[in-house]
């Protein structure tokens, strides 16, 4: 997808980009490729592929009408090179975005990126999702948690639901269909007092299938969740 195609598709969906936003995406691409040579950020470095499979793919929650352009608190778990939250932040500057990532080198990249793109209202923390979720400054503080290709729902739910306010939503972006995954996650979702609200399916402009599973938090998460770092993966609920 050429940058012009990206701009046009957004304009068609009533999301026209300003020159500044176009420049932000362009600089994002340049820094991604430059830093990818120092630290492994992505296997996708071709410009048209980045615009399609990283930028366009990341803004799906906005295109699907799931996220408003308001000062809401969004947490992105395991964002890697900033996907999906930072492309959404460029598009919707009002969003207040926090990223937690377990690799310090990636956090360094994200801090530089935010500086270069002049993004305000972005916060980066180095560490494990399981640890931060037990910190009262993070637990039950967010309207949305996003995770793109991070883990199966059975594991992902324990890593993310504790961060949500009651009524808040987890948006899990996936490239493969999730019905059997949701069956496996049924017990975990019940224990975490959360419920699958929707499982949206759509296609990228190149026809690649994509899914967003929307999970709503119904009640406060029991204090024992999430368990210690590594446990959700080792012994899923």
Curated annotation (Swiss-Prot):
Record localization: Cytoplasm
Gene3D superfamilies assigned to the protein according to its UniProt record, in alphabetical order: Vaccinia Virus protein VP39 (3.40.50.150)
Keyword list, A-Z: Cytoplasm, Methyltransferase, rRNA processing, S-adenosyl-L-methionine, Transferase
Spans annotated as Disordered: 218-237
Residues binding S-adenosyl-L-methionine, per UniProt: 78, 83, 129-130, 148
Top-rank EC class of the record's enzyme: transferase
Molecular-function GO terms, alphabetical: rRNA (guanine-N7-)-methyltransferase activity
EC number: 2.1.1.-
GO (cellular component) term, any one: cytosol
UniProt xrefs under CDD domains: AdoMet_MTases (cd02440)
Pfam families: GidB
Function: Specifically methylates the N7 position of a guanine in 16S rRNA.
Family to which this protein belongs: Belongs to the methyltransferase superfamily. RNA methyltransferase RsmG family.
Name of the protein: Ribosomal RNA small subunit methyltransferase G
Lineage: Bacteria, Bacillati, Bacillota, Bacilli, Lactobacillales
């Amino acid at each position: 997808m050429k940058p012009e195609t990206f701009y046009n598709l957004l304009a068609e969906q009533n999301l026209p980009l300003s020159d500044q936003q176009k420049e932000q995406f362009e600089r994002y691409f340049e820094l991604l490729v430059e830093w990818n040579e120092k630290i492994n950020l992505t296997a996708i470095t071709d410009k048209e592929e980045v615009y399609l499979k990283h930028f366009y793919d990341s803004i799906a929650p906005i295109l699907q009408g799931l996220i408003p352009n308001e000062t809401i608190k969004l947490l992105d778990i395991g964002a890697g090179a900033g996907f999906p939250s930072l492309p959404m932040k460029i598009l919707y500057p009002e969003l207040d975005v926090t990223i937690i990532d377990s690799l310090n080198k990636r956090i360094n990249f994200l801090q530089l990126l935010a500086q270069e793109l002049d993004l305000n209202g972005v916060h980066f923390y180095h560490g494990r999702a399981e640890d931060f979720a037990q910190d009262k400054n993070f637990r039950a503080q967010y309207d949305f948690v996003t995770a793109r290709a991070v883990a199966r729902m059975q594991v992902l739910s324990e890593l993310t639901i504790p961060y949500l306010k009651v009524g808040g939503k987890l948006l899990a972006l996936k490239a493969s269909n999730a019905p059997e995954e949701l069956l496996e996650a049924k017990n975990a979702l019940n224990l975490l007092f959360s419920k699958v609200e929707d499982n949206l399916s759509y296609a990228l402009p190149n026809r690649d299938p994509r899914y967003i599973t929307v999970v709503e938090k119904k009640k406060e998460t029991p204090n024992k969740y999430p368990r210690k770092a590594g446990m959700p993966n080792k012994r899923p609920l």
